[in-house]
Amino acid sequence: MAVIESVYARQILDSRGNPTVEVVLDTDDGAQGLGLVPSGASTGEAEAWERRDGDKSVYQGKGVLNAVKAVNEEIAPKVIGMDASDQRALDETMIELDGTPNKGRLGANAILGVSLAALYASAESADQPLYRYIGGTNGHILPVPNMNIMNGGAHADFATDIQEYMISPYGFNTYSEALQAGVEVYHTLKNVLKKQGLNTGLGDEGGFAPKMKSNKDSLNYIMDAISAAGYEPGKQIGISLDVASSEFYNKETGKYHFEGDDREAGYMLDFYENLINEYPIVSIEDPFQEEGWDDWAAITAKLGDRLQFVGDDLLVTNPARLAKGIKLGAANSLLVKLNQIGTVTETLDAIELATKNGFTSMVSHRSGETPDTTISDLAVAKNTGQIKTGAPARGERIAKYNRLLEIEEELGSTAQYAGYSAFKACKKYIAE
């Protein structure tokens, strides 16, 4: 038992220079945990509430001093004296204290900071690395890194409609080999773009963000880069997309403003089908808007045996929305973001529910990140087999990739790379 002795929050900056919450939690046995809270750019409407101050004269309204105050003045007195290692009891206490369905009083950024800090303090108290503390001895699978090497959408001033173009290096024996391949493709892509006279400035997540004439142009350049780097598209490296379609969906018209025109859901489904016939795409995230349950069910039924459809804005790491998706057959993969739901406990519950019902899980960063590496340990602890944490650039992204290298080394001969098996719905490339 590690009794919480003190909890203190402060305002710090994330990778985009926006304020976020840091929580320091100390226990009676000398352990200390640090909780650093990420923040998204394209967010689902059903996500837990991120508390911002709204004072336009300070950080353009994005300050989090009220969330900090909530930790120091409301949450801290309530949790001091509790067992930090009883994560469920701690998280439920904060949820009850908040008293709203979406953490809309205290703020998910306040609650998550404490939840994460308690998790780290408990792991230190138990003298265990975080992945071992969460997953026990069963956590041993290193995830496929889905690397966002070209940015569009809300991450890059809408250089393209599609928000993320990722490479998924699954055709390798170890995580370190896969990471090397991904990095080499990333650097090769820079040269490919330069030769075309295109800008190689970076988006929020470290990917290149040139203006493109079409979404397919980005895919073609990535295919060229994979081959030029000496790898086989499909066989060794697949492509994953985050369409983030809620960002260009018009609620009033019920249409998607895509490639310069307003499109019906049926057009979008046909577009995706043609895309996966033309390119080695193994995963599509948010192909439809966050309340388009019927459209999600239709694409999953039609194409779900060929690739994974990942629910981000649709499911928001929320066990209740995930249960609805399972019931309707909408999506077959869960994107896991700790700050979407706001506690460690609810995040773990969502992963377990997904696994139990045959969904894959992809543990994810946010576009506004910190040096925190929780998601790396979480992916290994729960054997999710997939992680997405941006391009192999920018320190806050590299920290996650480096943490996985450390874990792989620590696990030694027991480490297993998820590889192609991570994408359960995809069969055609490995069979060829």
Swiss-Prot record:
This is Enolase. Catalyzes the reversible conversion of 2-phosphoglycerate (2-PG) into phosphoenolpyruvate (PEP). It is essential for the degradation of carbohydrates via glycolysis. GO terms for cellular component: cell surface; extracellular region; phosphopyruvate hydratase complex. Keywords: Cytoplasm, Glycolysis, Lyase, Magnesium, Metal-binding, Secreted. One of its GO terms (biological process) is glycolytic process. Its EC number is 4.2.1.11. Pathway: Carbohydrate degradation; glycolysis; pyruvate from D-glyceraldehyde 3-phosphate: step 4/5. Binds a second Mg(2+) ion via substrate during catalysis. Its cofactor is Mg(2+). SMART domains: Enolase_C, Enolase_N. It is an enzyme of class 4 (lyase). Pfam families: Enolase_C, Enolase_N. It is found in: Cytoplasm; Secreted; Cell surface. CDD domains: enolase. Mg(2+) binds at D242, E285, D312. The active site is at E205 (proton donor), K337 (proton acceptor). It catalyses: (2R)-2-phosphoglycerate = phosphoenolpyruvate + H2O. PANTHER family: ENOLASE. Belongs to the enolase family. (2R)-2-phosphoglycerate binds at Q163, K337, R366, S367, K388.
